[in-house]
Swiss-Prot record:
GO BP, sorted A to Z: double-strand break repair via homologous recombination
Gene this protein is translated from: rexB
Source taxon at top rank: Bacteria
Further facts: Despite having helicase-like domains, this subunit does not have helicase activity.
Family: Belongs to the helicase family. AddB/RexB type 2 subfamily.
Name the UniProt record assigns to this protein: ATP-dependent helicase/deoxyribonuclease subunit B
InterPro entries xref list: ADDB_N (IPR049035), DNA_helicase_suRexB (IPR014141), P-loop_NTPase (IPR027417), PDDEXK-like_dom_sf (IPR011604), PDDEXK_AddAB-type (IPR038726), Restrct_endonuc-II-like (IPR011335)
Keyword Transmembrane part of the UniProt annotation: no
Length: 1071
């Protein structure tokens, strides 16, 4: 064995490549070994350093891959054992054990997290060269007994199913020990680069290679100063020193110092020396030179998005200077926090990248489909799960519009559960759903699912066959092929499909002869899919590489950007969480000298120093270290390592907000520039210098020219929320000149509430989602129908009998039967409505001096050639003197307010009066009023009553009164009825004023509507809060930002309120 160390200013790879070339020139076969995470980059670096740029004599690979070169022919043809397969084997083992067999873990048998921990422990045991029987000294002896039962049973299953229990390194080591490879190894030289420690498995293999290979060469970075130190605790080279010293002691060899021809920039060397001096308690009498600072940058940004954008702009600048994407490396302090953001931002700046991390399959449509399938079976055809299956795009031949229509109907009819999905859809609504088409679609969905879900407990092989048959029926494979929109997506789908078929194969192999329920089968496949990962190799090598900063090696790329280096992530504090604690691992390691667990937490300090050292030397030309103030919506502090750099004299540059400028980095990319222009267009203008204004004026002019060529438009607006007028063609279609505009009291109220709401409801005809479950509208229809029947009954039957008959016959109508007999909740609503009817009906019995002359009266009120007002009057009453009045049933409290009417928000009663005046020969003198009747079950607070007597009954009837507009002329006739006339009496002249102003409100609204321009102007009564419909989801209206666009209501003091509003009405209606 040969141990080599060198300073950070030299290239260890060049030194080791020279050693490899010498061995290759002598006829030896050389294996150049790199860590798993670096083998791809190391292969490219090694081949670059070779004069011939390639050779068959030197193979750059990993330990695992090297073992396959030697054992591929002699390895037994056994099944491959991966993590998913291991999890299934442990699940099967736990199925065969009873809870009482496992005192410690019996309650966790079906816990997926526990099974994952078992898989991790099994892999650790293999790497540590330990068996489950070596787990002595645990905190609880029962833990070892349970683990022995589980793992031994799992290993028995592996043997039965012909799985290879040995790892590739174990098979390689066994072949060497048996002397099967002596001839080959005697002609082999092994060069090892990039390691600072070996696992127990690697350590054992290394000892065998040292005894059988021609030579083993290992290199590591250690300074000569550190190598000569006797006390190395806390030294930045502590990990490498321990690594070399352990090997030197074990193999009785002295490490040698070497140098390379390539020497990197002195700035990085000087920074390393300062860093070393800080941690080995020595002092230096010099600082970084001014020109050294040109190679380092410390950035501070407010949050991650700005940080990534600054990096992207800097990369574009490097390209402008002539560098390539492959010259750039981006390191992430927290992969999970940055992974979702960095992709879209780099795409915006058109920067091709390769993320050096396996992607989880959990977000892929195939995994979502399998998960929805499993949940549909487990939760008995829940609607959300069925729809998620359809929306995955992998079920059947349905387009998006079909799925949307199916979803809309199932929500309306509340279709959920197998019973409702299996029956034909028969319920319809005013929207007239295409039931024939929906039932055909329902059958295409239900039949294959029903055939699969009816599977009883049976052999796993049979369940897999039925699942595959189901997947063929729904054309899963064909739909999977149709998902891809690009070559990259095609490659991703191929990798996901391969993992899926591997999981099915493993399940068939392990559970083929075990009896399982379908729910267990789907749950196991779903768990395997959700935990699986895949990798996609980049289509070109000229990309920006992105990976975690703790995987970096010295001198990786000319330009390195390390971002997210906050105190929480740099250094990383690794704590193991599993079935064994670190204390238990340490006790086991004390007993087993040459076989040991890796305890990450025990090596945090020296590993973090090693990582920081590699990071500070990762670049060969320029290193940028960046830290955000806020990461994952949490404030974080500077890393202690960055604080050290600041003490060395490196300035911390506050990058601030990513303002737009006329720098090359801002305008070097068309797509990014266009997105920035759009961002400017959406925000308030910021303070700009004359030079800035001139620059952006020219840029906008150029962009508009380019956009016009592409028939695109850059929108401009003076207000935050603005609307466009309808085109003349649309206005002519929606509001023909020769046809009167149709309005109603409700439509007029909506218009004055918020003009844009009128546009949505009555121009675009947008409606809220319907539901078969009764709402306030359906409740109102029911109450109207009961009272209509009651008032039509002129028989001599007692009033209570008439009421019972009206309720009974209304309940028997098919429409109300479908709605109110669907479930217990609807039946409860019906019971409440019946109570309301019984409570309100006595008011009709008391008013014996009135006669109902008409109900549910349709009217069309002609207001000239411009407007036709339509509506339905619930009831028309006639007093004993022949005067007529209008009753409007309300399911909620309502009363006429002259101020609300003046502002256009309560025109209903006055509109009905105008209609009654038009459709009857009576003049204004013979109209006694228009009123609301609140249909309610009065609630009284019994605490306020001293005793139960007539006052209690009077209070009930006081709540059941008619409230509205009444004629002062009919005051005497109204006094004997249940009419609340206080502050509600109007003279004939005043009633005429109300009618004229009501006409003015309609004409004013119609004139504005026909112009085709609808404002976003919900009303406000106080100028501080908005009461009108804001439609935030559509208009993005915000009261604090858009109060200026709200319509301010006219409000007057309560004193003389009526007279003042009438005066205003007279003025406006006669303009």
């Amino acid at each position: 064995m040969k141990l080599i160390y060198t300073e950070m200013s030299y290239s260890m790879t060049e030194i080791l490549v020279n050693e490899a070339r010498k061995a290759a020139d002598q006829g030896y076969r050389v294996f150049y070994i790199a860590p798993n995470s670096l083998s791809f980059e190391k292969e490219r670096e090694v081949l670059t350093l070779l004069p011939e740029r390639g050779t068959f004599s030197i193979i750059v690979t990993r330990f695992v891959q090297m073992s396959r070169y030697f054992t591929v022919e002699s390895s037994p043809s056994k099944q491959h054992l991966d993590d998913t397969t291991l999890a299934m084997i442990f699940y099967r083992a736990l199925m065969q054990l009873k809870p009482e067999d496992l005192p410690s873990y019996g309650r966790l048998q079906n816990n997926s997290v526990f099974i994952e921990q078992l898989v991790e422990l099994y892999k650790e045991l293999k790497n540590a060269q330990l068996s489950v029987h070596d787990l002595t000294g645990l905190d609880h002896p029962q833990k070892q007994e349970d683990l022995i039962k589980i793992i031994e049973l799992a290993e028995t299953i592996m043997i039965q199913q012909d799985y290879n229990q040995d790892s590739p390194l174990q098979s390689f080591a066994r072949a060497i020990k048996l002397g099967l490879l002596n001839n080959q190894l005697s002609k082999t030289v092994v060069v090892i680069d990039g390691f600072s420690r070996f696992s127990a498995e690697e350590d054992y293999l290394l000892s065998l290679l040292n005894n059988n290979c021609q030579e083993v060469i290992i290199g590591s970075y250690v300074s000569q100063k550190a190598y000569q130190k006797s006390f190395i605790k806390g030294n930045i080279y502590e990990a490498s020193l321990h690594f070399l010293q352990d090997l030197a002691q074990k193999y009785h060899i002295k490490p040698v110092f070497a140098t390379s021809n390539q020497v990197f920039k002195p700035a990085f060397s000087r920074l390393t020396q300062l860093f070393e001096a800080t941690h080995d308690f020595s002092q230096v009498d010099w600082q970084l030179q001014k020109n050294d600072l040109d190679h380092f940058s410390l950035w501070q940004c407010h949050h991650q998005k700005e940080e990534i954008e600054h990096v992207a702009k800097s990369i574009r600048q490097k390209l402008y200077e002539g560098y390539r994407y492959k010259d750039i490396l981006v390191l992430l302090g927290d992969m999970d926090a940055y992974q979702l953001q960095i992709g879209p931002i780099f795409d915006k700046f058109e920067i091709p990248y390769y993320l050096g991390k396996a992607e989880p399959m959990a977000a892929h449509p195939l995994v979502q489909f399998i998960e929805s399938l499993e949940r549909s079976q487990r939760y008995n055809w829940r609607r959300e799960d069925i729809l998620n299956m359809l929306k995955s795009g992998l079920f059947g031949c349905f387009d998006d519009s079909d799925i949307d229509r199916f979803e809309e109907y199932t929500q309306f009819a509340d279709i959920k559960g197998f019973t409702k999905f299996s029956k034909p859809f028969t319920i319809n609504s005013s929207r007239q759903y295409p039931l024939d088409f929906l039932n055909e679609m329902r059958q295409d969905i239900v039949l294959p699912l029903q055939e699969l879900f009816k599977s009883q407990k049976q052999l796993g092989a049979s369940l897999v066959d039925k699942l595959i048959l189901f997947l063929k029926k729904i054309r899963l494979a064909e739909n999977m092929q149709g998902l891809a929109q690009s070559q990259l997506e095609v490659e991703k789908n191929e990798e996901v499909w391969k993992r899926f078929t591997d999981i099915l194969t493993s399940f068939h192999h392990i559970f083929g002869q075990e009896k399982l329920r379908l729910s267990d089968c789907l749950a196991l496949i779903k768990t395997g899919m959700k935990s699986a990962q895949y990798r996609v190799v980049p289509a070109t090598l000229d990309v920006v590489t992105i990976k975690s900063y703790d995987l970096v090696q010295p001198h990786s790329k000319p330009f390195v950007y390390a971002i997210g280096l906050t105190q929480s992530h740099f250094p990383k504090q690794i704590h193991h969480s599993g079935l064994l604690s670190d204390q238990e691992r340490a006790r086991i390691n004390e007993i087993r000298n040459y076989r040991h667990f890796d305890i990450a937490s025990a090596e945090n300090s020296k590993k973090n120093h090693q990582t920081a050292l590699s990071l500070f030397n990762a670049a060969t030309k320029e290193l940028v270290l960046s830290v955000p103030t806020v990461i994952n919506e949490t404030f974080d502090d500077l890393s202690p390592y960055l604080k050290e750099l600041i003490n060395f004299g490196l300035p911390l540059l506050d990058k601030g907000k990513n303002y737009l400028s006329y720098d090359n980095s801002d305008i070097g990319n068309y797509k990014a520039l266009l997105s920035q222009i759009i961002a400017i267009n959406r925000q308030d203008l910021i303070e700009m210098s004359d030079q800035d204004k001139m620059f952006w004026t020219v840029v906008l002019r150029y962009l508009r020219k380019q956009l016009r060529k592409q028939q695109l438009e850059l929108p401009t607006s003076d207000y935050r929320l603005s609307t466009k007028s309808l085109s003349k063609e649309v206005i002519e279609v929606c509001f023909p000149k020769r046809i009167p505009l149709k309005l109603s009291a409700t439509a007029l109220t909506v218009f004055y509430n918020n003009q844009y709401n009128y546009f949505l409801k009555y121009v675009l005809n947008l409606n809220k989602t319907e539901s078969i479950h009764p709402d306030s509208r359906i409740h109102g229809q029911y109450l109207h129908r009961v009272f209509e029947r009651l008032m039509k009954d002129h028989t001599q039957e007692p009033f209570d009998n008439k009421l019972k008959q009206a309720i009974y016959h209304t309940n028997q109508e098919s429409f109300f039967q479908q709605i109110y007999q669907d479930n217990a909740e609807a039946e409860y609503s019906l019971a409440i409505l019946e109570d309301i009817v019984r409570s309100t009906a006595p008011i009709l019995q008391l008013n014996q001096n009135i006669q109902v002359i008409d109900q549910e009266k349709n009217f069309h009120l002609d207001m000239g050639n411009e407007i036709l007002v339509h509506g339905i009057i619930d009831r028309i009453d006639q007093l004993s003197d022949g005067s007529l009045g209008i009753v409007d049933y309300k399911s909620s409290a309502n009363q006429f307010d002259i101020g609300t009417f003046y502002n256009g928000l309560s025109p209903q009663l006055v509109t009905y009066l105008a209609a009654l005046k038009q459709i009857t020969p009576h003049d204004i003198n013979q109209l006694f009023g228009a009123m609301y009747l609140h249909l309610q079950d009065p609630k009284l607070d019994l605490v306020t009553f001293k005793q139960i007597d007539n006052t209690l009954v009077e209070s009930i009837y006081k709540a059941l009164t008619y409230k509205g507009i009444f004629s002062e002329v009919e005051k005497e006739h109204l006094s004997t009825g249940a009419y609340q006339t206080k502050n509600a009496l109007y003279s004939n002249d005043e009633l005429e004023t109300l009618l004229n102003y009501n006409r003015y409100l309609y004409l004013k609204a119609a004139k504005h509507i026909k112009k085709g321009h609808f404002l976003i102007n919900p009303y406000t009564s106080d100028g501080k809060t908005v009461q009108g419909d804001q439609l935030k989801a559509i208009t993005r209206f915000e009261a604090d930002l858009d109060m200026g666009q709200a319509r301010r209501l006219v409000t007057l003091p309560a004193k003389e309120k009526k007279e003042c509003f009438l005066t205003l009405m007279r003025k406006e209606s006669h303009l």
